[in-house]
Amino acid sequence: MTQTGSARFEGDSWDLASSVGLTATMVAAARAVAGRAPGALVNDQFAEPLVRAVGVDFFVRMASGELDPDELAEDEANGLRRFADAMAIRTHYFDNFFLDATRAGIRQAVILASGLDSRAYRLRWPAGTIVFEVDQPQVIDFKTTTLAGLGAAPTTDRRTVAVDLRDDWPTALQKAGFDNAQRTAWIAEGLLGYLSAEAQDRLLDQITAQSVPGSQFATEVLRDINRLNEEELRGRMRRLAERFRRHGLDLDMSGLVYFGDRTDARTYLADHGWRTASASTTDLLAEHGLPPIDGDDAPFGEVIYVSAELKQKHQDTR
């Protein structure tokens, strides 16, 4: 059985085959599955080779199509299809966010906790756009080396910032050439649930401090990751872990996310000068003709996608 070292602790670190890093591999595998669907919403040609390079057998088989849903138990097959659907609409949402931001004239993009994100290689960026990728050093190094080995080249000026988001990443970002006097498009995709309430607020403070009016930001709100729903969601995550264990993978999401009450990112953003818009997973699935996801196939509950534009910077933001 593949051991992932799931338990979180202060100052923990990971690679793409363990702990929080393994979730990036899981999501990339789902992007590969989603890309094979009829009328696919996403086309991430780098997802499968990156997952293969990480080498976690279950996700390699999933990404390559060797893990045929028809050969799985009914709950596993449906769960795999629905997870791929969820990641398709998520990827499509953040892809479009960046494309819309560049159409609005923004030429500076930041991907926080970039993991196996390949947007700097697969999206069509306008000339002069700089894309900054921020993640732990071993994650950045692995992806850069792997894609170079595949002969892939970025489609824009890609700059890597090898730093933990719990450290002084704004300084590292500026050293890489980030200009906080220019409008920026930021994404924190699949990130906030893996931060404590305090770390989430600090990250949002830092993003706001590094933004000028006209900057844009997109993320997700895990509406149900709170004390009220903790028991139910932990149960869903444990049952998902049992599905994984049937295939030799030890990954328990309940040991990776931070439960408990936290500020809703929409409330934070509105209180700090951002104008927000949001759409639920259910809304986005329906928009693309896909059925809703619920029960054990929604281990995080209802996910809300949020985009925001900074209208007026408040004086108390540091």
Swiss-Prot record:
Keywords in alphabetical order: Methyltransferase, S-adenosyl-L-methionine, Transferase
InterPro entries reported in the protein's UniProt record: Ppm1/Ppm2/Tcmp, SAM-dependent_MTases_sf, SAM_mthyl_Trfase_ML2640-like
Recorded GO MF terms: methyltransferase activity
EC annotation from Swiss-Prot or TrEMBL: 2.1.1.-
Keyword Flavoprotein tagged: no
TM spans (from-to): none
Annotated S-adenosyl-L-methionine binding sites: 135, 164-165
GO biological process, one term: methylation
Function noted in UniProt: Exhibits S-adenosyl-L-methionine-dependent methyltransferase activity.
Family of this protein: Belongs to the UPF0677 family.
Protein name per the record: Putative S-adenosyl-L-methionine-dependent methyltransferase Rv0731c
Organism: Mycobacterium tuberculosis (strain ATCC 25618 / H37Rv)
